[in-house]
């Protein structure tokens, strides 16, 4: 992003700049629909919105989705349709399920795969606002964990009262089982870094 500036907004992260010739606001505020909805509300109060892109990680619910693959939603289940950006890079499409909890295990993912192709935690709140405001909506995600992969811990237990992930809780859990937990967390960190790079490359190449 060119000419990035940091606005004084009450969010975890916010930058204003230009991407592919368009003015953009990049914001992040933590996991879940409440925090994501608050982020979009703050943006709307401060700038004019021409389109909204919900982006980040997702969990695959079908074997056809591999780690670091780009997933573009055609629909957020229960919250309406989503548009598809133009990109020269490969991506897969399908239905996106948005729920307010981390789907931690492959066992939990299996039944969800009957109604959607991927799962995440924020898109529903963003989609509902976009449709209410008649603003074009996109949901672009990158797969951080396949349908047959489980996380090394239940990250739902690692959230603070406001819904954000607590680094202190994660570190405490890792210290209780260092021999098994730490190597798995390092693998997860490596996997998510690779996925984040793939997502960034795709977004930089896309037209919304």
Positions of the model-derived regions?
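Short, conserved "active-site rim" segments that organize catalytic pockets and cofactor/ligand binding
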Residues: 1-5, 70
């Amino acid at each position: 992003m060119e000419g990035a500036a940091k606005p004084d907004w009450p969010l975890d992260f916010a930058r204003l700049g230009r991407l592919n010739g368009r003015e953009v606001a990049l914001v992040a505020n933590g996991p879940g629909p409440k925090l994501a909805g608050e982020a979009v509300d703050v943006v709307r109060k401060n700038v004019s919105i021409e389109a909204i892109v919900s982006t980040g990680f997702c969990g695959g619910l079908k074997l056809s989705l591999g780690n670091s693959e780009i997933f573009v939603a055609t629909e957020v289940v229960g919250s309406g349709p989503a548009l598809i950006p133009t990109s020269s890079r490969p991506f897969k499409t399908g239905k996106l399920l948005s729920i307010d909890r981390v789907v931690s295990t492959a066992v939990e993912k299996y039944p969800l795969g009957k109604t959607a192709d991927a799962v995440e935690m924020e898109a529903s709140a963003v989609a509902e606002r976009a449709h209410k405001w008649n603003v074009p909506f996109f949901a672009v995600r990158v797969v951080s964990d396949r349908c047959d992969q489980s996380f090394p811990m239940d990250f739902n237990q690692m959230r603070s009262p406001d819904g954000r992930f607590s680094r202190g809780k994660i570190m405490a859990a890792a210290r209780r089982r260092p021999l098994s937990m730490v190597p798995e967390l390092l693998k997860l960190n490596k996997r998510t870094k690779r996925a984040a790079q793939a997502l960034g490359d795709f977004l930089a190449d896309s037209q919304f």
